[in-house]
C-alpha cells in the first residue's frame, strides 16, 4: 500500500516536473522571443532615433548652411556699403579741399585788394591834406602877378615910387610865405622845353638859337610841394636841319 502510494506520488511528481520543465522551456522560448522582439523593437527604435538624428542633423546642417549664407550675405552687403560710403567720403573730402583752396585764394585776393584799397585811401587822404591849400594858392597867384606888374611899372614920380617900394616889400613877404608853404616858381626861360612843366603858346624858328628851347615866358608857372600847380606858358624855338635845307 505504501509503495503504491509512493509510486503514485512519484509519478505525480515526475508529471509535475515534466510539466514544469515544459513550462520552463516555453518560458525560455517566450523569453527568447520576447528578447528577440525587444531587440527588434530596440533596433527599430535605434533606427528611428538614428533616422531622426540624421534628419535632425541634416536639418541643422541645412539651417547652419542657411544661417551661414544669411550671415555671409549681410557681411557682403555691409562691406559694399562701407566701401561705397568710404568712396563718398573721399569724394566729399576732395570737394571740400578744393572749395577750401578756392575760398583761401579768394580770401587772399580780397585781403590784398582791401590792403591796396586802404593804402590808396590813406594816400588819397594824405594828399588831400597835403594839397588842401592848392585852390587857395592858385586863386592867390593871379592878384599876386597883377601886383608884380604894377610894381614893375616904370614911373618918375617919387611919391609913387615910394608906394611901389612898399608894395614890393609886401610882395616879397607874400612870396616868402608861399615858399614856406611849398610853392616854387618853375624855371623856364632859356631852358629846354619840357611838356610836363611847360605849355607852348607860341613857336618860332631861329636857327641861331638852340632847338626846343623856351625863348620867352608868357606866364609864370608854379609847383606846390613838387606837384604842378600851374604850367608855365612859353614861346618855344623849333627848327631842324630838314627845315633849314628846305628853306
From Swiss-Prot:
CDD domains, alphabetized: GrpE
Compositional bias (Basic and acidic residues): 31-49
Any GO CC annotation of this UniProt entry: cytoplasm
RNA-binding as UniProt keyword: no
Comp. bias intervals (Low complexity): 50-68
GO molecular function, one term: unfolded protein binding
Protein name (Swiss-Prot/TrEMBL): Protein GrpE
Organism whose genome encodes this protein: Onion yellows phytoplasma (strain OY-M)
Amino acid at each position: 500500500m505504501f509503495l503504491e502510494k509512493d509510486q503514485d506520488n512519484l509519478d505525480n511528481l515526475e508529471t509535475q516536473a515534466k510539466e514544469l520543465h515544459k513550462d520552463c522551456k516555453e518560458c525560455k522560448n517566450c523569453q527568447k522571443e520576447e528578447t528577440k522582439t525587444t531587440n527588434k523593437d530596440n533596433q527599430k527604435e535605434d533606427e528611428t532615433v538614428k533616422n531622426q538624428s540624421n534628419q535632425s542633423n541634416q536639418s541643422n546642417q541645412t539651417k547652419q548652411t542657411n544661417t551661414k549664407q544669411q550671415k555671409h550675405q549681410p557681411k557682403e552687403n555691409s562691406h559694399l556699403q562701407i566701401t561705397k560710403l568710404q568712396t563718398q567720403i573721399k569724394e566729399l573730402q576732395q570737394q571740400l579741399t578744393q572749395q577750401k583752396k578756392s575760398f583761401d585764394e579768394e580770401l587772399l585776393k580780397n585781403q590784398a585788394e582791401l590792403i591796396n584799397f586802404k593804402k590808396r585811401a590813406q594816400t588819397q587822404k594824405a594828399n588831400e591834406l597835403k594839397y588842401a591849400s592848392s585852390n587857395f594858392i592858385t586863386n592867390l597867384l593871379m592878384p599876386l602877378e597883377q601886383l608884380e606888374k604894377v610894381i614893375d611899372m616904370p614911373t618918375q614920380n617919387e611919391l609913387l615910387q615910394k608906394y611901389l617900394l612898399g608894395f614890393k616889400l609886401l610882395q616879397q613877404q607874400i612870396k616868402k610865405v608861399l615858399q614856406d608853404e611849398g610853392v616854387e616858381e618853375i624855371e623856364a626861360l632859356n631852358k629846354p622845353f619840357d611838356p610836363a612843366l611847360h605849355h607852348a603858346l607860341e613857336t618860332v624858328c631861329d636857327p641861331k638859337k638852340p632847338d626846343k628851347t623856351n625863348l620867352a615866358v608868357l606866364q609864370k608857372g608854379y609847383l606846390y610841394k613838387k606837384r604842378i600847380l600851374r604850367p608855365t606858358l612859353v614861346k618855344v624855338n623849333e627848327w631842324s636841319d630838314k627845315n633849314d635845307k628846305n628853306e
